[in-house]
Amino acid sequence: MFLRIFGFFISAIVSLVIYYEVSNVNFSSDEPNKDKLLVDLVSYVLDKLHYDPKVINDDFSIKVYDDFIDAVDSQKRFLLKSDIELFSQYRLLIDNQINSSDITFFNLVHETLKTRIDEVEYFYEEILEVPFNFQVNEEINLDYDNLEYAENSNDLKKIWRKRLKLSALDGYASKKEINDEEKENDKLSSDSEIEIESRSSISDNLKDFFQFNSELERSDWFSIYLNTIVTQFDPHTSYLAPEAKEVFDQNISGKFQGIGARLFKRNQQVEISEVIIGGPVWRDNLLNVGDIITAVAQSIEEEPTEISLMKLSDATDLIKGEKGTNVYLTVKRVDGGIEQVQITRDIVELAETYAKSSLIKDAANTYGLINLPRFYVDFDDYGERNAASDIKKEILGLKSKAVSYTHLTLPTMLMV
């Protein structure tokens, strides 16, 4: 048990060191050698600091190749058989490329994948314009591990038609069941109307999917590639780009500085999906679920910046900020009204992160139950609340109530 825990923490340290080393190198985002330098730094850190360094050889190369292809197209929705044949020439060469900071393989996969995704985005709408005939029996292979890649673009389009038909059939069956239950309320829809609704739902979902994909930058794909390299050392070691490191810190500490709202993007609009209890927005009742943020300013005098065409992460960066500072949001309310809202940022705690205790009573005893949803710590300030100190407080609190015993529940997917 000690070795498992020790290995976990060493891996976590390596992950943070990789982030630190890379994030403290100064280079512009458009510098052509940036990615090569990242490969060089990551391989150096892993070789010198990892507790169990690996030999980067042909076996290592094969694993990186297989994992990367699986990571970018696990369901074989985009790449063609000819693409895989082209990529396979590098299957035994990735180790050499890592050692020489060469990224030819990544460049080839990235450019090819972008092209294939664009092709699918072009033809999926064409498929969904035509009603599906659910009276015609067809077969589709969903065993992705044993599924062959499409021979060509026409073959891929046929595969997509079957997959979309299956999705539409699933939606059709669900909607028809609801429809049949509403017969008494005279809300019955025809089968053709239900089929149209099913295709429309799929279209909306795919628009969101391709919108998200269009916002992915080269660095996002390169992070995937780097992580297929570092996870060969052990499953707990990972490369964190600066943006991912910020999210990691937020998740591991259970808090962040901002307005206290969760956002999502749909149809080029940034919408409030949740107001976080205890945050500035919640305390002053400033925003509601469904409100749309159209622009952001950092002062009352500043011209608001339109955010509809931004990546969601970039828009979020404009909205978040240090405790005590103000942000001015142009908001379209659910009722259609538009107004500018001033919000003073603060520290927002995610209550679902932290340890909590409760009492359970039966006829003879009172029991204490402590629930720890996840491990948490603030790496910037170890004096702040963390899982260990909070558990101690909860135990002492339960002891003061003279419970019969305490029991700690842990998430089953976390290592302890």
Locations of the language-model features?
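Cleft-lining beta-strand/loop regions that shape enzyme active-site pockets
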Residues: 23-26, 31, 48-56, 213-218, ...
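Soluble non-cytosolic domains of exported or imported proteins
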Residues: 32-37, 54-59, 63, 103-107, ...
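Hydrophobic membrane-insertion alpha-helices, especially the h-region
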Residues: 7-19
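PDZ/PDZ-like domain segments forming the peptide/carboxylate-binding groove
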Residues: 54, 70-71, 92, 109-122, ...
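Terminal peptide-recognition signature
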Residues: 64, 225, 261, 281, ...
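Single conserved hydrophobic/aromatic residue that forms the stacking wall/gate
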Residues: 407-416
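Extended, domain-scale alpha-helical bundle/helix-rich regions
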Residues: 130-252, 256
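Charged, amphipathic alpha-helical regulatory modules used
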Residues: 25-124
